[in-house]
Amino acid sequence: MEIKISTEYIKLDQLLKFAGVVGNGSDAKILIFEEEVSVNGEIATQRGKKIRPGDVVQVGDQVINVCWTGLSF
């Protein structure tokens, strides 16, 4: 799936909610704590990690490609 952002970055837990992977922040926290989320192939351990355009986030078999909308920051 492709998620477009118009800001410089989005925090990992916010991205998971925005993409519909989780319903709320506590679910995102659990997924990250259980090491179920990777960013660019590395296990993510910080729910506030800054995700930028070009990053690839994976949760199980779901892959999220983060892109920039082209609008200015």
Task: Please state what every model-predicted region is.
Residues 7-53:
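A basic, amphipathic helix-loop patch mediating RNA/tRNA/ribosome contacts
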Residues 1, 12-15, 64, 72:
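Small beta-barrel nucleic-acid-binding modules, principally OB-folds
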Residues 1-7:
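N-terminal beta-hairpin/loop module of FHA
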Residues 2, 18, 34, 61-63:
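Low-complexity, intrinsically disordered short peptide segments enriched in small/polar/basic residues
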